[in-house]
Amino acid sequence: MFKTFIIAAVAVATVRAAVIGHDQVVPFAQPTPTSISQTTAVNFKPQLHITNGCHPYPAVDADGNTSGGLNPTGSSSAGCKGSGYGSQIYGRSAWYNGVWAIMYSWYFPKDSPSSGFGHRHDWEHIVVWLDNPAVASPKILAVSTSAHSGYTVYYPPNSNYLNGKSAKIDYYSILLINHAFRMTSDAGETQNLIMWDQMTDAARTALQNTDFGDANVPFKDGNFESKLANAWYQ
C-alpha cells in the first residue's frame, strides 16, 4: 500500500511539471538565510544592468514547471522586458582552491542580438570569489563573468564596478554577437535570490533535466564544478 502511494505521488509530481509560457513562471520568494553561506550570498548579491536584450526572468517555479523561452524574433527585447511576477537570481556556493566561490546565475527567455539571430533561452552567470565567508568582513578577491562559453576575469575588480559588496554586471551584445556579461560602472537592479539548496526538489530536478537548447544551467550538478574550474581567476 505504501509503495503504491509513493509511486502515485511521483506520477502526480511528474504530470504537474510542464513547460509553460516564459511570462507565467512564478519566481521563488527570497528565503530568510539559515546558514553562513546563505547569508553571505545575500550580502554579496550583485546588480544587473541591461544594455540591450531581454530582462531576466524566472526559469522554474516551485512545482518544477520551466520556461518555454522565446523565439529570437522581433527586437532583442521584444516580448521579454520583464515578468509581471518578478524576476529571479540563482545562486550556489562552495570552496574552490581554498577560496569561497559564489556563482550567481540569471535566465533570459532568448538570446537575440538582432531579429532572426540568436537562439531560444539564455543562461549567463558570474562567480564572485571571496577570501572567507566566515570572517567578519569577507573580501572580494575577483569576479569572473560569463562570455561566449568562456570568462572575463576581473582580478581585482575596479572599485567603480562595485557598489559596496555588490558587483555591477552588464548584459550586452555587440552587432550580431550573442549576449554576454561584463562588469560595469552603471548601476543595475537586484532580484530575489534563491540558492540551489533552498529550492524544492521539483525545481532542482527540473533544472537538472530540462533541455534549454543552446543554453545550459551553469549551477546544476555536473556543470557547477567544471564552471568554477574554467572561471578560476589565477
From Swiss-Prot:
One of its GO terms (cellular component) is extracellular region. A motif (Hepta-peptide GHRHDWE motif II) lies at residues 118-124. InterPro entries: NPP1. Induction: Expression reached the highest levels at 3 days after inoculation of pepper leaves, followed by a gradual decline. Residues 1-17 form the signal peptide. It holds the Pfam family NPP1. A motif (Conserved undecapeptide motif I) lies at residues 101-111. Keywords: Glycoprotein, Secreted, Signal, Virulence. Glycans are attached at residue 65. It is found in: Secreted. Its main location: secreted. Belongs to the Necrosis inducing protein (NPP1) family. Secreted effector that contributes moderately to virulence during infection by P.capsici. Does not cause visible reaction of C.annuum for several days after inoculation, but by 7 days after inoculation, small necrotic lesions become visible. Leads only to chlorotic areas, without necrosis at 7 days after non-host N.benthamiana leaves infection. Key residues/motif important for the effector activities are degenerated in most NLPs, including the nlp24 peptide consisting of the conserved region I (11-aa immunogenic part) and conserved region II (the heptapeptide GHRHDWE motif) that is important for phytotoxic activity. This is NLP effector protein 10. It comes from Phytophthora capsici. The lineage of its organism: Eukaryota, Sar, Stramenopiles, Oomycota, Peronosporales. The gene is NLP10.
